[in-house]
Regions:
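A compositional/structural signature for long, glycine/proline-rich flexible linkers
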Residues: 26-369
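Bacterial N-terminal signal peptides that target proteins for export
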Residues: 1-10
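Extreme N-terminus of proteins, especially the signal/transit-peptide cleavage junction
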Residues: 1, 24-25
C-alpha cells in the first residue's frame, strides 16, 4: 500500500472516531451540589491583591502573601494586648534606676514636674511609687495612714486597694503579699494579698495639708516598712529617695524594643497568670516562655512595622473613639471621654472590650475599681 493511501486510511479512521456519538456523562451515586461559599474560585480579589488557587490549594505566591498577612495581623493584635505588661516593664525599669526592688521607696516630695516622664501623672500631689519582688517569698508592706493607693501586678491586673479605699480604711496597716503558688503558713494580723505575679507595683498619694506636702511625706517616711515575712522581727532599713525634678522615664517604647520588653515579662512570670489565648498569640510571633526570642530578618521586619501600626491604632482608639459608649455625652464630637469602658476589668457581658483595654493602657497608669 502506498504511503499516500496509508495516510488517507488513518485520517479516515480518526474522522470516524470523532464523528461517533459520545456516551452520556456518568452519573455518580454520591454527586452533591456544593453550596456557595464552600468551594473557592481559582482567583480571588482581596486587599492583599489577587489570590490564586488550584482546586482550593494556594499557589506559592499566594501562600507567601497569606502567611505574611497572618504574621502581621497577629503581631498587631499582640502589640495591642501587650501594651499593659510593656508599660509595667518600662515603669519598673525607670524606678529601678532609682534603686533596687523591696528596699527603695521613691517619693515625689515636692510633687512631680515635666522632667519625669510618666503616664497620667498629677502635679498637685506627692506620690510614693515603688516595686516589689516576691521571688524569695512573702513580703510585708507596712502602709502609713492617710494615703490613697493601689497594688497592680505585672500584667496590670488589679490586686488590691491601699489606704483610704483599701482594707485599712486610711488608718494604715500591715499588708502581707503572697507570691504565686504560695502554700506556706499565713500568720494572723495582716491584710493578706495573693498576687498572680512575682513583680508587683505599689503607688499611693498623700495630700497637702494647708498647702504643705511635708506632713504627708513625713508620715510615709515614718511608718512605711518593707521586709520579708521571715525578717518581721528585725526589718531592714529602707532607702527613701526624693525624685521630684528627677530626669527619668517610665513610659514604654512604641517601636521594635516593645517586643523585647514583652518577651522579658513573658519569661519572668508564671504562664498561669495569663490566659492561654493571649499567650498563644504572643507565641505565634516568637515570644514564648522558656524559648529564645530571635526572629529572622523577614519576621523582624514584620514586627517592626506591626509595632508602628499598633501604636498608631492605639492612638486612634484613644484619641478618636468611634462609638458613643466611650463618651460621657451621646454626641461623639464631645471630647469628654470615659476612662474605663467596661469597668476596671474592661469587660462587658463576660467579654473583654478590646479597644477599651488597649486604649487605656496606651495613655494611663494604674487599675483600680
Amino acid at each position: 500500500m502506498k504511503r499516500k493511501t496509508v495516510l488517507l486510511v488513518i485520517l479516515g479512521l480518526i474522522l470516524a472516531v470523532l464523528l461517533m456519538p459520545m456516551p452520556a456523562m456518568a452519573q455518580y451515586k454520591m454527586t452533591t451540589t456544593v453550596p456557595l461559599g464552600i468551594a473557592l474560585p481559582d482567583k480571588v480579589e482581596t486587599r492583599l491583591g489577587t489570590l490564586k488557587f488550584f482546586d482550593g490549594f494556594p499557589d506559592n505566591a499566594t501562600l507567601e502573601k497569606l502567611y505574611d498577612n497572618l504574621d502581621f495581623q497577629r503581631a498587631v493584635q499582640a502589640y495591642l494586648l501587650g501594651l499593659a505588661p510593656v508599660s509595667q516593664v518600662a515603669n519598673r525599669k525607670g524606678i529601678r534606676e532609682v534603686g533596687p526592688d523591696n528596699t527603695t521607696v521613691p517619693i515625689f516630695e515636692t510633687m512631680m514636674n515635666a522632667r519625669s516622664i510618666f503616664l497620667t501623672p498629677n502635679n498637685n500631689t506627692p506620690y510614693t511609687w515603688f516595686w516589689l519582688d516576691l521571688r524569695k517569698g512573702p513580703l510585708v508592706v507596712e502602709v502609713p495612714p492617710k494615703v490613697l493607693g493601689l497594688l497592680d501586678d505585672m500584667w496590670y491586673h488589679f490586686v488590691t486597694d491601699i489606704g483610704m479605699v483599701g482594707p485599712d480604711k486610711g488608718e494604715g496597716g500591715k499588708y502581707l503579699l503572697l507570691p504565686p503558688g504560695y502554700k506556706g503558713e499565713v500568720p494572723k494580723g495582716y491584710f493578706v494579698v495573693q498576687s498572680a505575679t512575682y513583680s508587683n507595683w505599689i503607688a499611693w498619694r498623700t495630700f497637702l495639708e494647708n498647702g504643705d506636702p511635708k506632713p504627708g511625706v513625713d508620715r510615709v517616711k515614718k511608718f512605711t516598712k518593707i521586709y520579708p515575712l521571715s525578717q518581721a522581727a528585725n526589718p531592714p532599713k529602707l532607702n527613701f529617695v526624693n525624685v521630684s525634678g528627677r530626669d527619668f522615664n517610665t513610659v514604654g517604647p512604641a517601636d521594635y524594643p516593645f517586643w523585647e520588653y514583652l518577651n522579658q515579662v513573658v519569661q519572668e512570670e508564671p504562664t498561669e497568670s495569663v490566659d492561654p489565648v493571649t499567650l498563644g498569640l504572643w507565641a505565634s510571633i516568637g515570644i514564648q516562655k522558656g524559648k529564645p526570642f530571635n526572629p529572622d530578618a523577614p519576621m523582624k521586619k514584620i514586627l517592626t512595622e506591626a509595632a508602628l501600626v499598633g501604636d498608631a491604632t492605639a492612638r486612634a482608639i484613644m484619641y478618636r473613639w468611634r462609638t458613643p459608649d466611650g463618651y460621657y455625652y451621646p454626641d461623639t464630637k464631645s471630647a469628654w471621654r470615659l476612662g474605663f469602658v467596661g469597668g476596671y476589668k474592661f469587660e462587658e457581658n463576660g467579654a473583654r472590650v478590646l479597644d477599651a483595654y488597649s486604649g487605656f493602657f496606651f495613655y494611663a497608669t494604674g487599675v483600680t475599681p
